[in-house]
Swiss-Prot record:
Disruption phenotype: Embryonic lethal. Increased tolerance to iron deprivation. Over-accumulation of iron ions in phloems, rosette leaves, flowers and seeds. In normal conditions, at the late reproductive stage, aborted siliques and abnormal necrotic lesions in cauline leaves. Increased root elongation, rhizosphere acidification, and iron reductase activity under iron deficiency. A zinc finger (CTCHY-type) spans 1071-1134. This is Zinc finger protein BRUTUS. One of its GO terms (biological process) is cellular response to iron ion starvation. Pathway: Protein modification; protein ubiquitination. It comes from the Eukaryota. GO terms for molecular function: iron ion binding; ligase activity; ubiquitin protein ligase activity; zinc ion binding. Interacts with the PYEL proteins bHLH115, bHLH104 and ILR3 in the nucleus. Binds zinc and iron ions. A zinc finger (CHY-type) spans 999-1068. It comes from Arabidopsis thaliana. Zn(2+) 6 binds at residues 1110, 1113, 1124, 1126. Zn(2+) 5 binds at residues 1091, 1094, 1109, 1116. InterPro entries: Hemerythrin-like, RCHY1_zinc-ribbon, Znf_CHY, Znf_CHY_sf, Znf_CTCHY, Znf_CTCHY_sf, Znf_RING, Znf_RING/FYVE/PHD. Zn(2+) 4 binds at residues 1076, 1079, 1090, 1097.
Length: 1254
C-alpha cells in the first residue's frame, strides 16, 4: 500500500510563500510510488526555467522508499499465502533499506529538523520521536527474519503483518513530512538557504552510505525523474568542479567506495536489480552531470602507490588518532580549570562547541572501530561498553554546561558548577586514555600480524569513510596539524594507497583538506614534482568535454596558487546569501577551517571547502552522531531522553511525580483504545478458520472501537488541540497529530472495506457449501469456483491481519507520542481550573447514548483506583449540572444491573438515591386512608421537615410542599373517581381509549406530542397522553420520571413503559421514534436528544452536533455560542419577563450579552420598548447607531443659560465606571465608553470641564 506523493504547487524562487497552510510541490513528483509515468516538467530545473525549491529533491527519496516497502511487503504477502520466496534475499533487501533509511533519518534530525526549529517551533520534535518508533519496527522485523521457520504458518503470517505495519508507519510518516515539513521549509527559508540545507544534509550522511544513497535513489525512479534529480543536484552542489565530480561519480554508481567500506556488493546490487523502476546499465546510459553531452574519455591519474617498504605499519595510525584526541581532551580539561579560576562565562559557548566537536570525533572513531577494525580482526574484541561510557560522559558534560548557562553568572551555585566541570573533564580524559591503552595493546598487535600492508591501508581508508564529509573536512586538517611532518606525510600516503582507483576525486578532496592543517597549506607530498593528487588532478585531459553550467569553475591548475585560491572564493551566487556570515572558529581549529593560505614556494594545495562548517543556521551535529552509534551497536532505537535538540532535555520532566491533573482523564481513553486494538490484532488471526457468528462479533467490536476512536479524535481536534495552540509558545505543536487522525481514519475505512468484502465472501462460501450438501453434486466447475473463493478468502484474511497489526502499531505509536509530548504541556501551561473547563467542554459535547456506552468501555480497561479518580474528575467538572443524578439513574436502569445494592457501581450513591426514592414514594403517592388520618399539625410537621432538609434543591422543596398541601385533595380525587368508575364500568379504567393528534388521518397523539401511547400518572393513577395534558386538567404537576406504565393506543393494553408494545398482536409496534427511559418521553415527530447534564430531553440533533452543554451555565447552547459569557447556573431561574422556569421550559431561550437569559418571544416583545437587561441593566446589544442618534440630538439642543454650567455625577451600567457629564434632564453620556445607558448619582454645579470618568 504505497502512499502516493501529493500534488504540490510549484514552489519557485527564493522562499516561495505557501498558499494557505500547505505548500504544493511540483506535479513532476506527484505520481505514486508504483507509477512510471513520465514527468510533465522534466526540464523544470533547466537554466531557462524558474528555480524550483531544492527541498523537493527529498520527494525522490520518499518515492524510492515507498516503492521498496511496497515491493517487499508484496513479497511477504506472497510468502504468507504459500508462494516460494527467498527469505535470504528478502532479509538482505530489508537490511539495505534499513541502513539507507536510518542514515536519512539521522541526517534529517541533524539538519532538516534543526533548521526548521530555528524558524518554526514545536514541529521537529514529533518527527524525531517518530524516527525512533520506526527504528523499533525495523528491530522487530529483523527479529522475525533472523528466526526464520519457513514451515510455520503462523510465522509466515506474522512476517506479513510486520512488513505491512512497517510500510504503513513509514509511508504515513513520509506523507506527513510532505504535508507539513516541506511546505514550512519552502515558506520560511530563502532559496539559497534551502540549497544550503540540502547540501548540508548530503554532507551529514557518512561517505560510505552517501555513495550508496544517491545511486539507489536514481535507480528507483524513472529515467525522466533521474534526469530531473541530476539537474536539481547541479543547483544544490557548490559549483566547484571537484565537488561536482565527487557527487556525480557516486550518483552514476561509478565509485567503489561501497565495496571498500564493507557494504556487500551483492546486497547493494540485489536492491538495485529488484527496484520496481530499475534502470539497467544506468551508469552507462546516463551521463554524469559534470560531463558533456557526449561521453568523453577521461584519463585519471593513477594514485601514487608508495609501496610497503616502510617499517611502520599503517594500522599504527590509529595511535595517531588516539594521540590527537588525548591532546584535545587535555586542552579541554585545562580550559575547564581556567574557567573555574576566572569565573568567566564569556567563552563558555566556544568551550561547549569545542566539546561537541571532540565528542563527535570520538563517537565516529568508535563507530569505525566497531564496524571496520574489530570485525576484521580474528579475535573476539568488543569495546562497546567503553564506547557507551564515553558517550554518556560526554552527554553529562554537555548537560552540565547547559545548566551553567541557564543558571547564570550570578548564581550562588556557580562555584559548584565549575568544580563539577573540572571533575567531568578529568573523568572523561581518564576514561579515554584507559580505553585507548587497552586497544593499543590488545587489538593493534593482531591487526599488524593478520593483515597485509595493503589491507591495513584499506581498513584505514574505510574507517575514515565512516564519517560524513562535513566532519572529514574539519577532522583531516585538525589531525595533520597535530602530527609531525613525517607522520603527516605517511598518513597521506596510506590514505591515497588505501582508496580504490575510482575514488580519485574524493581522495583529491581528502588530500587537499589534510594539507590545510599544515603551515600555510603546505603540500604533504614527498617533493614538489606533482605526486600530490591535488596537483596531478590538473593534468586530467578531457576529450570532447562540453562546458556545464553547474561545473563552470575551473579546478586548481598549475597557475599561481594565489589565483587559484582567489578563484575558489568565487562561489556561486546562490551560496553567498547563506555563507556571507562571519565564520566561527574554535580554539582547536584556528587556521584549519579557513581554507588554503598560499605560500611563496608554490607547493600549497588548494581544494574547495564544502561551505557547511560555516554554520550560519547554527545546526547541531553531535545528536545525529550519537544516534548513529546507538543504532549501529545494538540496533535498538536511541533512548527517548537522548536529546536531539537542547530544548528536549526537559521533555520527561513533566507528567511524572505529580498529582494527576484533570486532563489526564481524557488520556485514560488511550488505555481502552489500546486494549481493543490488542483484541483486534489477536482475534484477526482467527478469521481464516471461523464461523459466521465470530465474523459478526468481530465486525461489531471493530465498529465499537471505530466509533469511540472517532469521538476521541474529534474531541482532540476540536477542543484539546485548539486549547494548546491558543498558547503563544505552543503554536504548531498539534498539527502533526491532526494529520495522524486523518491517516488513521483512512486506515479504519480501509479495514472496513476489506472486512465487508470478507464477510460477503464468507457468506457465499457457506451458502455454496449448503447448496452442495443439498444437491449432493460435486462438479468440476463447483470445485474450481470454491477453490478460487477459498484462495481469495485466505488472501483477504491475511491482508486483514496485516491491516489490524498496522493500525494497532500506528495508533499505539500515536498514543505514546501524545502522552510523551502533549500530556506534560497541559500540566505546564494550564491551571487546574482551565483543565476542568477543557474536560467539561469535551464531555459537554458527548451525548447520553455515547456516554452510556463509553463509560463501561473505558472503566473496564482501568484499575479501581483509576476508575475512581476519573469519575471524581468528571464530577468535579460537572458539579453545576445534573450529571450525578443522570449517572445514578443510568446505573439503576441498566439492563445488566440487578435490584441488589451489591451489583451497583457506587453503593453510597445508590443509598442516597434510594433514600430520595423512598421519600418520593411517601410524599408523592400516599395511601388516601393514611392521608385522611393525618391531622393538620402532623401535616405541618412534615412540611417543616422538608423546609429544614438542606440536601434538597429549592425547586424540589417547593414541589414537595405543594404536594403536601394538596395531598388531602389529591387523595380524595384519587378515591372518588376510582370508586365511581368501578361502580359504573367495573374494570374499565378512565382514559382507556385512543387519542388523536390528527383525527382525520387517525394519527395518534395529542396537541403537544405525536405518539402511540398514553402514560399512567403516578400522582393520580390516571391515563394521559402527556404531562401537559395532565397539568391542563389538574391542579398539580405530573412527574413524568415516576411513570411506570403505559397504554398502547392500538391494542389498548396497559403494560410496563417501554419503546415498543409487548402485546403479541401488535408485533413490536413502536410507541415513537424517540423514547427516553429516564424522562419517559415519547416523540414521533421531532429530533430529540437527552442531555445527561440537564438530565432532560431537549429538542435538537444532539450534543456535539448542534448543541453543547456549558458546565458553568448548566444549560444547552447552540454550537455557535461556544465563546459566550458564562454565569453559574444562569438558566436555573425564571424568565424575567414571563416568570416561567427557564431550565425546564420548552420554549426557545435567548442568551443576552450580559450572560442572562430570557425567552426569545419575550425578548422580541421586550426590546420593542427597552434596550437594557431587566436584571442587570446592561445594554442588550450594539447600540452604537442609537447612541449616535442621541449625540446628534444633543448637539442640536441648546440648554437654558442657568443649566449650561451644571454637571452631574453618573454611573455607567455598561462599563460600570463613574464619571461626570453635562447636565441633561434625560440623556447622560458616559465619558469612558460613550454609552447613554447611565444613571445619575449626584447633581451639582461645577466648572465647565466636567466630561471626565474614573
Amino acid at each position: 500500500m504505497a502512499t502516493p506523493l501529493p500534488d504540490f504547487e510549484t514552489a519557485r524562487g527564493g522562499g516561495a510563500v505557501a498558499s494557505s497552510s500547505t505548500t504544493v510541490l511540483p506535479s513532476s513528483v506527484s505520481s505514486s510510488s508504483s507509477s512510471s509515468r513520465p514527468l510533465p516538467v522534466a526540464n523544470s530545473f533547466s537554466d531557462d526555467a524558474e528555480e524550483i525549491s531544492p527541498i523537493l529533491i527529498f520527494l525522490f527519496f520518499h518515492k524510492a522508499v515507498c516503492s521498496e516497502l511496497e515491493a517487499l511487503h508484496r513479497l511477504a504477502l506472497e510468502f504468507a499465502t504459500g508462494h516460494h520466496v527467498d527469505l535470504r534475499l528478502l532479509r538482505e533487501r530489508y537490511r539495505f533499506l534499513r541502513s539507507i533509511y536510518k542514515h536519512h533519518c539521522n541526517a534529517e534530525d541533524e539538519v532538516i529538523f534543526s533548521a526548521l526549529d530555528i524558524r518554526v517551533k514545536n514541529v521537529a520534535q514529533t518527527y524525531s520521536l517518530e524516527h525512533k518508533g520506526e527504528s523499533n519496527l525495523f528491530d522487530h522485523l529483523f527479529e522475525l527474519l533472523n528466526s526464520a521457520t519457513e514451515t510455520d504458518e503462523s510465522y509466515r503470517r506474522e512476517l506479513a503483518r510486520s512488513t505491512g505495519a512497517l510500510q504503513t508507519s513509514v509511508s504515513q510518516h513520509l506523507a506527513k513530512e510532505q504535508k507539513q515539513v516541506f511546505p514550512l521549509l519552502i515558506e520560511k527559508f530563502k532559496y539559497e538557504e534551502q540549497a544550503y540545507i540540502v547540501w548540508r544534509f548530503l554532507c551529514s550522511i557518512p561517505v560510505n552510505m552517501l555513495a550508496v544513497f544517491l545511486p539507489w535513489i536514481s535507480s528507483s525512479i524513472s529515467v525522466d525523474e533521474s534526469k530531473e534529480m541530476q539537474t536539481c543536484l547541479k543547483k544544490i552542489v557548490p559549483g566547484e568542479k571537484l565537488l561536482q565530480q565527487v557527487i556525480f561519480t557516486w550518483l552514476g554508481g561509478k565509485s567503489n567506495t561501497v565495496a571498500s567500506c564493507r557494504i556487500e556488493d551483492s546486497m547493494f546490487q540485489c536492491c538495485l536489480d529488484s527496484s520496481s523502476s530499475m534502470l539497467p546499465c544506468k551508469a552507462s546510459r546516463e551521463q554524469c552531470a559534470c560531463e558533456g553531452s557526449k561521453i568523453g574519455k577521461r584519463k585519471y591519474p593513477e594514485l601514487t602507490n608508495f609501496g610497503s617498504s616502510d617499517t611502520l605499519h599503517p594500522v599504527d595510525e590509529i595511535k595517531l588518532w588516539h594521540k590527537s584526541i588525548n591532546k584535545e581532551m587535555k586542552e579541554i580539561a585545562d580550559e575547564a580549570r581556567k574557567i573555574q579560576l576566572s569565573g568567566d562565562f564569556s567563552d563558555l559557548s566556544a568551550f561547549d562547541e569545542r566539546l561537541q566537536y571532540i565528542a563527535e570525533v570520538c563517537i565516529f572513531h568508535s563507530l569505525a572501530e566497531d564496524k571496520i577494525i574489530f570485525p576484521a580482526v580474528d579475535g573476539e574484541f568488543s569495546f562497546s561498553e567503553e564506547h557507551d561510557e564515553e558517550e554518556n560522559q560526554f552527554n553529562e558534560f554537555r548537560c552540565l554546561i547547559e545548566n551553567i548557562k541557564s543558571a547564570g553568572a550570578s548564581s550562588t551555585s556557580a562555584a559548584e558548577f565549575y568544580t563539577k566541570l573540572c571533575s567531568h573533564a578529568d573523568q572523561i580524559m581518564e576514561t579515554i586514555q584507559r580505553h585507548f591503552h587497552n586497544e593499543e595493546i590488545q587489538v593493534l598487535p593482531l591487526a599488524r600480524k593478520n593483515f597485509s600492508f595493503k589491507r591495513q591501508q584499506e581498513l584505514l581508508y574505510q574507517s575514515l569513510c565512516i564519517m560524513p564529509l562535513r566532519l572529514i573536512e574539519r577532522v583531516l586538517p585538525w589531525l595533520t596539524a597535530s602530527l609531525t611532518e613525517d607522520e603527516a606525510k605517511n598518513f597521506l600516503k596510506n590514505l591515497q594507497a588505501g582508496a580504490p582507483k575510482s575514488d580519485v576525486a574524493l581522495v583529491t578532496l581528502f588530500s587537499g583538506w589534510a594539507c590545510k592543517g599544515r603551515k600555510a597549506g603546505e603540500c604533504l607530498s614527498p617533493n614538489g614534482n606533482g605526486l600530490c593528487p591535488v596537483k596531478t588532478l590538473s593534468n586530467i585531459k578531457e576529450v570532447n568535454l562540453q562546458s556545464c553550467n553547474a561545473c563552470a569553475s575551473v579546478p586548481c591548475t598549475s597557475r599561481s596558487t594565489k589565483s587559484c585560491c582567489q578563484h575558489q572564493d568565487k562561489r556561486p551566487a546562490k551560496r553567498t546569501a547563506v555563507l556571507s556570515c562571519e565564520k566561527k572558529t574554535t580554539p582547536h581549529s584556528t587556521e584549519v577551517a579557513n581554507g588554503c593560505k598560499p605560500s611563496g614556494n608554490g607547493r600549497s594545495c588548494c581544494v574547495p571547502d564544502l561551505g557547511v562548517n560555516n554554520n550560519c543556521l547554527e545546526l547541531g551535529s553531535l545528536p545525529a552522531a550519537k544516534a548513529m552509534r546507538s543504532s549501529s551497536l545494538n540496533s535498538a532505537a536511541p533512548a527517548l531522553n537522548s536529546s536531539l535538540f537542547i530544548w528536549e532535555m526537559d521533555s520527561n520532566s513533566f507528567g511524572t511525580g505529580h498529582a494527576e491533573r484533570p486532563v489526564a482523564t481524557i488520556f485514560k481513553f488511550h488505555k481502552a483504545i489500546s486494549k481493543d486494538l490488542e483484541f483486534l490484532d489477536v482475534e484477526s488471526g482467527k478469521l481464516i478458520d471461523c464461523d459466521g457468528t465470530f465474523i459478526r462479533q468481530f465486525i461489531g467490536r471493530f465498529h465499537l472501537l471505530w466509533g469511540f476512536y472517532k469521538a476521541h479524535s474529534n474531541a482532540e481536534d476540536d477542543i484539546l488541540f485548539p486549547a494548546l495552540e491558543s498558547k503563544e509558545t505552543l503554536h504548531n505543536v498539534s498539527h502533526s497529530y491532526t494529520l495522524d487522525h486523518k491517516q488513521e481514519e483512512k486506515l479504519f475505512g480501509d479495514i472496513y472495506s476489506v472486512l465487508t468484502e470478507l464477510s460477503i465472501l464468507h457468506e457465499k462460501l457457506q451458502s455454496d457449501s449448503m447448496m452442495e450438501d443439498i444437491a449432493q453434486t460435486d462438479t468440476v466447475r463447483t470445485d474450481i469456483d470454491n477453490g478460487d473463493c477459498n484462495k481469495k478468502y485466505n488472501e483477504l484474511a491475511t491482508k486483514l491481519q496485516g491491516m489490524c497489526k498496522s493500525i494497532k502499531i500506528t495508533l499505539d505509536q500515536h498514543i505514546f507520542l501524545e502522552e510523551l509530548e502533549l500530556w506534560p504541556l497541559f500540566d505546564k501551561h494550564f491551571s487546574i481550573q482551565e483543565q476542568d473547563k477543557i474536560v467539561g467542554r469535551i464531555i459537554g459535547t458527548t451525548g447520553a447514548e455515547v456516554l452510556q456506552s463509553m463509560l463501561p468501555w473505558v472503566t473496564s480497561a482501568l484499575s479501581e483506583d483509576e476508575q475512581n479518580r476519573m469519575m471524581d474528575t468528571w464530577k468535579q467538572a460537572t458539579k453545576n449540572t445534573m450529571f450525578d443524578e443522570w449517572l445514578n439513574e443510568c446505573w439503576k436502569g441498566s439492563p445488566d444491573s440487578s435490584s441488589t445494592e451489591t451489583s451497583k457501581p457506587s453503593p453510597q450513591k445508590d443509598n442516597d438515591h434510594q433514600e430520595i426514592l423512598d421519600q418520593s414514594g411517601e410524599l408523592f403517592k400516599p395511601g388516601w386512608k393514611d392521608i385522611f388520618r393525618m391531622n393538620q399539625n402532623e401535616l405541618e410537621a412534615e412540611i417543616r421537615k422538608v423546609y429544614q432538609d438542606s440536601t434538597l434543591d429549592p425547586r424540589r422543596k417547593d414541589y414537595l410542599v405543594q404536594n403536601w398541601r394538596t395531598s388531602r385533595w389529591i387523595a380524595a380525587q384519587q378515591k372518588l373517581p376510582k370508586e365511581a368508575e368501578t361502580a359504573v364500568n367495573g374494570d374499565v379504567e378512565l382514559g382507556c381509549s385512543p387519542s388523536f393528534r390528527d383525527p382525520e388521518k387517525q394519527i395518534y397523539g395529542c396537541e403537544h406530542y405525536k405518539r402511540n401511547c398514553k402514560l399512567r400518572a403516578a400522582c393520580c393513577d390516571q391515563l394521559f397522553t402527556c404531562r401537559f395534558c395532565h397539568d391542563k386538567v389538574s391542579d398539580h404537576s405530573m412527574d413524568r420520571k415516576l411513570v411506570t406504565e403505559m397504554l398502547c393506543m392500538r391494542c389498548l393494553k396497559v403494560q410496563p413503559v417501554g419503546p415498543i408494545c409487548t402485546t403479541p398482536s401488535c408485533d413490536g409496534f413502536p410507541m415513537a421514534k424517540h423514547y427516553c427511559s429516564i424522562c419517559k418521553l415519547f416523540d414521533d415527530e421531532r429530533a430529540v436528544y437527552h442531555c445527561p447534564f440537564c438530565n432532560l430531553c431537549r429538542v435538537g440533533e444532539g450534543l456535539g452536533i448542534d448543541f453543547f452543554h456549558c458546565m458553568t451555565c448548566n444549560c444547552c447552547l447552540g454550537m455557535k455560542l461556544v465563546n459566550h459569557k458564562c454565569l453559574e447556573k444562569s438558566l436555573e431561574t425564571n424568565c424575567p419577563i414571563c416568570c416561567e422556569f427557564l431550565f425546564t421550559s420548552s420554549e426557545a431561550v435567548r442568551a443576552l450579552p450580559c450572560g442572562h437569559y430570557m425567552h426569545s418571544a419575550c425578548f422580541q416583545a421586550y426590546t420593542c420598548s427597552h434596550y437594557t437587561c431587566p436584571i442587570c441593566g446592561k445594554s442588550l446589544g450594539d447600540m452604537a447607531v442609537y447612541f449616535g442618534m442621541l449625540d446628534a440630538l444633543l448637539a442640536a439642543e441648546e440648554l437654558p443659560e442657568e443649566y449650561k454650567n451644571r454637571c452631574q455625577d453618573i454611573l455607567c451600567n455598561d462599563c460600570e465606571r463613574k464619571g461626570t457629564t453635562r447636565f441633561h434632564w434625560l440623556y447622560h453620556k458616559c465619558g469612558s465608553c460613550g454609552s447613554y445607558n447611565t444613571r445619575v448619582i449626584k447633581s451639582e454645579t461645577i466648572p465647565p470641564d466636567c466630561s471626565t470618568s474614573s
